[in-house]
Amino acid sequence: MLLPAPALRRALLSRPWTGAGLRWKHTSSLKVANEPVLAFTQGSPERDALQKALKDLKGRMEAIPCVVGDEEVWTSDVQYQVSPFNHGHKVAKFCYADKSLLNKAIEAALAARKEWDLKPIADRAQIFLKAADMLSGPRRAEILAKTMVGQGKTVIQAEIDAAAELIDFFRFNAKYAVELEGQQPISVPPSTNSTVYRGLEGFVAAISPFNFTAIGGNLAGAPALMGNVVLWKPSDTAMLASYAVYRILREAGLPPNIIQFVPADGPLFGDTVTSSEHLCGINFTGSVPTFKHLWKQVAQNLDRFHTFPRLAGECGGKNFHFVHRSADVESVVSGTLRSAFEYGGQKCSACSRLYVPHSLWPQIKGRLLEEHSRIKVGDPAEDFGTFFSAVIDAKSFARIKKWLEHARSSPSLTILAGGKCDDSVGYFVEPCIVESKDPQEPIMKEEIFGPVLSVYVYPDDKYKETLQLVDSTTSYGLTGAVFSQDKDVVQEATKVLRNAAGNFYINDKSTGSIVGQQPFGGARASGTNDKPGGPHYILRWTSPQVIKETHKPLGDWSYAYMQ
């Protein structure tokens, strides 16, 4: 693990060099590994701890304030977060920050910025490493239970998100930040050159989604690690878990005012931060229309900013599984069911369109329907046999229901399985498989963000044309997968689909990226592809300064050729 902060700091500040043209030597290294995903088998200690945490949350509502300037603040605009699978259970009571409070948060953040930016990276890294250790150990059951109850995740989906991925973000970002300090320019005597990785000048607005607790922690945490101050607007439907992450960071040693925790109405928050002259960045995950609107607001206000704001955004996708006739059928079926229906299809990377060759369709269809009948949808807190639970809220339920009604009425579409909806207790939608005769049907093109898988069956001899179709059908470019045992086909698909997916999988499902292994993100309408989880992501949140110090005075202003 990491050296103690004083020792690491000394190591970072003592980069020896000898001779012309040699780079500074990085004398310290932080070794980290991906957090193991726990199994939660019957009788295991992690399962017992989680069940106790779930029991403690049953019927309970937590009061969550805005936290501005190290002060807990309540406004009159009270909101509630309900459990998706039991909307009669209010899991959190919180309030929206008004414009005045948001401006106060900006002022408090700016007042803390210089001191935080000057803090050695080793000290900042230690805070996030401690938070990761807390999440890995004593706070694991709490964050999992709050993610399950508040966001409707099953135990494994909560585990790979709120525990493993969030822990990995904190640890790997710390590793990358420490190593970045060692990336220095060459020095040629009589001069010494160095780079200082400063935070951005101003504040960063972090706007996080409901579907991953880890994303919220990273959107706010990564800029803070790099010396920035942050206004964090968490999702209304992930408030319970987001506040737990914030509290853990504070308990791990994050000073007050570095991250302001400000639930707020989305448009008001966007208007307020983009009208501030001190905005220096927006770190966003959410919908394409919202990100475009924020981008336009920044452009309209460009003349007032002290610096050009950095915009990083991840906006979803219409992700594909392309199947060649040489594919392994069981791999296709299992991977597609997981990708399309885990967490109710509410992952940015979820498979939403499946392209199958005619020769394999009878076999794949039969296996999909057979396995579909075994999928259990229910209460993940009471029944650990649940594969996925309710969708996040009434708005999402209504949108998905509208798509299912479209599937029933369109002459080009046939519902093969599922598609029933029931919001009497929770926002439940059955996993639905739809076959489309038209590859350009809207259900094959537009993001649904629910448990709906659309299938197009193509002629075997048209696989190259179908690859072109996959590439051109949607405006997105987030994730995709190709299933084939033919290396030539894989090579062809990789070329044709080069820009169709920022995360491209061969004989594997389109979901499940792991920090440090598959940095995540896509281009086109899917976002700015800054690849959180990778070593380059933190560069978005630093403004490097290069310093040259000359050790031999310049004795004469004139040049030799002038003599």
From Swiss-Prot:
SUPFAM superfamilies: ALDH-like (SSF53720). The modification N6-succinyllysine is found at residues 31, 93, 99, 114, 130, 175, 347, 395, 509. The active site is at residues 314, 348. GO terms for biological process: 4-hydroxyproline catabolic process; proline catabolic process; proline catabolic process to glutamate; proline metabolic process. It is found in: Mitochondrion matrix. Its EC number is 1.2.1.88. NAD(+) binds at residues 208, 233, 286-290, 447. The modification Phosphoserine is found at residue 44. Keywords: Acetylation, Disease variant, Mitochondrion, NAD, Oxidoreductase, Phosphoprotein, Proline metabolism, Transit peptide. CDD domains: ALDH_F4-17_P5CDH. Residues 1-24 form a transit peptide. The record marks 211 as: Transition state stabilizer. Its main location: mitochondrion. Substrate binds at residue 513. InterPro entries: Ald_DH/histidinol_DH (IPR016161), Ald_DH_C (IPR016163), Ald_DH_CS_CYS (IPR016160), Ald_DH_CS_GLU (IPR029510), Ald_DH_N (IPR016162), Aldehyde_DH_dom (IPR015590), P5CDH/ALDH4A1 (IPR005931). GO terms for cellular component: cytosol; mitochondrial matrix; mitochondrion. Pathway: Amino-acid degradation; L-proline degradation into L-glutamate; L-glutamate from L-proline: step 2/2. It catalyses: L-glutamate 5-semialdehyde + NAD(+) + H2O = L-glutamate + NADH + 2 H(+). Homodimer. Irreversible conversion of delta-1-pyrroline-5-carboxylate (P5C), derived either from proline or ornithine, to glutamate. This is a necessary step in the pathway interconnecting the urea and tricarboxylic acid cycles. The preferred substrate is glutamic gamma-semialdehyde, other substrates include succinic, glutaric and adipic semialdehydes. Belongs to the aldehyde dehydrogenase family. It is linked to Hyperprolinemia 2: An inborn error of proline metabolism resulting in elevated plasma levels of proline and delta-1-pyrroline-5-carboxylate (P5C). The condition is considered to be benign, but affected individuals can exhibit neurological manifestations that vary in severity. Clinical signs include seizures, intellectual deficit and mild developmental delay. This is Delta-1-pyrroline-5-carboxylate dehydrogenase, mitochondrial. It comes from Homo sapiens (Human).
